[in-house]
C-alpha cells in the first residue's frame, strides 16, 4: 500500500474509531433511565469527545478553573467536606488537591464518566452522589415547567465549601431540547425556562451558609476565520451575574470543530467567594 492510499483512508478510519468509542462509552456508562431518555448521557458523551479533540485548546480554561477552585478552598476556615456540583467529567476539578485539603469530597452530578468512577473506587473519601441540582427534572420530563427550588445539603453542617463547576449555562440545554422535541415547546418558552433555571441555581448557591465558588460561562462569542467577532450571545439567557469576579476566555470550539469558517469562544466568569 503506498503512502497516498494510506493517507486517503486514515481520516475515515479515525472517524469510525471515534464513533465506535462514543458508542462504547454510551453503552457502558451508568445513567438513570429518565436522564438517559432526556438526552443527558448523549450530551455528556459528546462533551467528553469534544474534550479529547480539543484538549490543548481547553487547557488554559481548565487551569484557570482549577486555580480559582483551589483559591476558594485555601480561604476556607473549616476543612470538613467540599461539595462539587457538575463533577461528572472531572476535567476542571483539582481532585487530588481538594483531597489534600478536606476530609471528604462529594462529587455531585446526574452521571459520572469513567475517571470519576475510578477515582471513587480508589479513594474512600470521595463520594459520588447522583443529584439533580435543579430538583425539577422529574416534572420537566413530564412537560411541567414549574420549577422546584433545590434544597439538597443546605442543612448539612459538614459542608465547608460548595463549588459550582461550569454548569450554570448547561442547566437548560438538555431540558429545552427535550421539551422542544417532545412537547413542542416554543422558543420564547425555552428562553423563559432557561432564565428560571439560571436564577434558581444562583439562589440555591446563595442559600448556603458556607463559602461558595462559582465558575460559569457568561457569553458565547462566534468568530470568523480572521478572528473577528461576528456574534455574541448570552450563555445565561440574559440573566446577569453579580459584579466582580474574574473573567477569561475558553476556546471551546476552535476552527474546524463546528465548520471551517467559524470558531466559538466562551467568556467565563469565576467567583472565589460568590
Residue locations for each model-derived region?
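Class I SAM-dependent methyltransferase Rossmann-like catalytic core
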Residues: 21-76
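Charged, low-complexity C-terminal accessory regions
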Residues: 217-274
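S-adenosyl-L-methionine
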Residues: 122-155
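Conserved class I S-adenosyl-L-methionine
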Residues: 79-90
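A short SAM/SAH-binding and catalytic strip from SAM-dependent methyltransferases
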Residues: 149-153, 160-180
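Conserved beta-strand signature within the Rossmann-like core of class I S-adenosyl-L-methionine
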Residues: 211-217
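Mobile active-site "lid"/loop adjacent to the S-adenosyl-L-methionine
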Residues: 170-198
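Conserved SAM-binding loop of SAM-dependent methyltransferases across substrates and taxa
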Residues: 89-101
Amino acid at each position: 500500500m503506498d503512502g497516498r492510499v494510506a493517507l486517503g483512508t486514515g481520516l475515515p478510519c479515525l472517524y469510525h474509531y471515534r464513533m465506535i468509542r462514543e458508542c462504547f462509552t454510551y453503552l457502558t456508562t451508568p445513567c438513570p433511565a429518565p436522564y438517559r431518555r432526556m438526552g443527558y448521557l448523549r450530551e455528556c458523551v459528546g462533551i467528553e469527545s469534544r474534550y479529547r479533540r480539543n484538549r490543548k485548546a481547553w487547557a488554559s480554561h481548565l487551569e484557570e478553573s482549577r486555580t480559582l477552585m483551589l483559591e476558594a478552598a485555601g480561604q476556607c476556615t473549616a476543612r470538613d467536606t467540599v461539595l462539587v456540583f457538575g463533577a461528572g467529567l472531572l476535567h476542571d476539578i483539582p481532585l487530588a488537591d481538594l483531597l489534600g485539603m478536606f476530609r471528604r469530597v462529594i462529587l455531585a452530578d446526574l452521571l459520572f464518566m469513567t475517571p470519576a468512577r475510578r477515582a471513587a473506587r480508589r479513594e474512600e473519601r470521595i463520594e459520588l452522589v447522583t443529584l439533580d441540582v435543579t430538583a425539577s427534572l422529574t416534572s420537566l420530563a413530564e412537560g411541567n415547567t414549574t420549577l422546584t427550588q433545590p434544597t439538597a445539603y443546605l442543612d448539612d453542617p459538614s459542608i465547608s465549601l460548595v463549588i459550582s463547576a461550569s454548569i450554570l449555562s448547561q442547566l437548560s440545554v438538555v431540558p429545552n431540547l427535550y421539551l422542544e422535541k417532545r412537547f413542542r415547546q416554543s422558543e420564547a418558552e425555552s428562553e423563559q425556562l432557561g432564565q428560571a433555571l439560571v436564577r434558581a441555581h444562583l439562589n440555591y448557591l446563595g442559600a448556603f451558609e458556607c463559602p461558595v465558588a462559582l465558575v460559569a460561562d457568561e457569553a458565547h462569542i462566534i468568530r470568523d476565520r480572521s478572528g473577528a467577532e461576528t456574534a455574541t450571545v448570552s450563555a445565561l439567557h440574559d440573566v446577569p451575574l453579580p459584579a466582580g469576579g474574574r473573567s477569561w476566555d475558553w476556546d471551546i470550539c476552535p476552527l474546524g470543530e463546528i465548520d471551517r469558517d467559524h470558531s466559538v469562544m466562551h467568556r467565563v466568569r469565576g467567583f472565589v467567594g460568590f
